[in-house]
Structures are given as structure tokens and as C-alpha cells.
């Protein structure tokens, strides 16, 4: 009966807020395709940091030669910026208009809903700092956070030393500021874990919403896969962050 009451509450909430099925499905889809796929790729490419500054800088330079500059920016706008903006704005609206009921029904699904909303807010704050600093302040505006050689082609790219300075690595010779230091490292640790959790937990909802996991057995399997993905991405990301924060730059 408690499950039925929870479902009834959910139905009443949905009926009273005029949520569009289409917008909810697009929100779910955008969180996985393309944003979730890009997250996995971004973690994978940044694993080069574990091999040192030269390998990381070489990876960044290689990625930026794969496509013409104009097409690269267009692809970034269409596949990352716009989906992220929609997913974030709609997610904020859902978080503000929703009414978590963990106080009345302390089921795993209700707690999952609450943690999904909280992790999404923290992830959004982290992404604003991450993109605003490394993509905009450094790459687009050319304001490096640590001493770097002047690029021969005039194209400013984020370097290993930039990221190390951003995270507060003293060996980077970067200056402690509001966008660089130990507080940023703490934000990155918390923010990346929240981002990964938000994605992997949302992956379950995506599979259920789109009918990819029908039945309890399929849903349990998806849950196991989501947890494994969370662990793998978290270990990889924390390894990268700790390497760039505490590792040598020589």
C-alpha cells in the first residue's frame, strides 16, 4: 500500500505541474547522448595526464588538429553547449518545481531522486568553473594560469601546467587566486564525483524511460552496470586529479 501511495503522490505531482513527456524524454536523452558519452570520452582522453605533462600536452594538441577550427567550434556548440544548456535549465526547473517526499516515504527511489537533484546542482556549479576557467579564460582569451611557451601557431591551448596551477599544484609556478588553488582542487574532487553520479544514476532512468530495461531483472542489471561505471569513472577521474595536483611537473 505504501508503494501505491508513493505512486499516487507522484502522479498527482505530475498532473499538477504540466510536465511535457517530450521535454522529459529529451532531458533524459541529452544527459546520455551526447553529454554522458562526452563525459566518458573526456575522462578517457585525460588519462594521458597519468603519463606526465608531455603526454597530456601532446594529447591536447592532437585533438585540436583533428578538425578545422571553425567546424570544431560548431561541433562543440551543437553537441555539447546547447545540450548542456537545455539539460541544465530544464533540470533546474524540475528541481525547483519538484517536491521530494523522502520524509514520508524513505524508499531508495525517493532518495535517488533527491541525490540526483543535489548532485545536478553541484555538477552545474563545477562545470561553470571548469568551462569558464579552462575553456574560456585560458583557451579562448589566452590567459594562462602558469608560465607556458608562446605557441608557434598563435593558438592558445590548455597545458598540463595550466590545469596543475588551477588545482593548486605549487610546482606549476602558478599564482594562487580565486580561480586557482586548494579550494579549486576540493571543488573538482566533489564536482567530478557529483557529475559522474548524476550521469550514472541518470543512465538508469534513461534505460527505463526509453524502454531499454523492462522488468525487474533488466532493471537490476542496468543498476549493476551503472554502479560499475560510476566506480570506474570515479577511480579514473580521481587518479587524474591527484596526479595533476600533487605530481611532479618535470
Language model features with spans:
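Membrane-embedded alpha-helical bundles that constitute the cytochrome b-like, heme-associated redox core
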Residues: 1-250
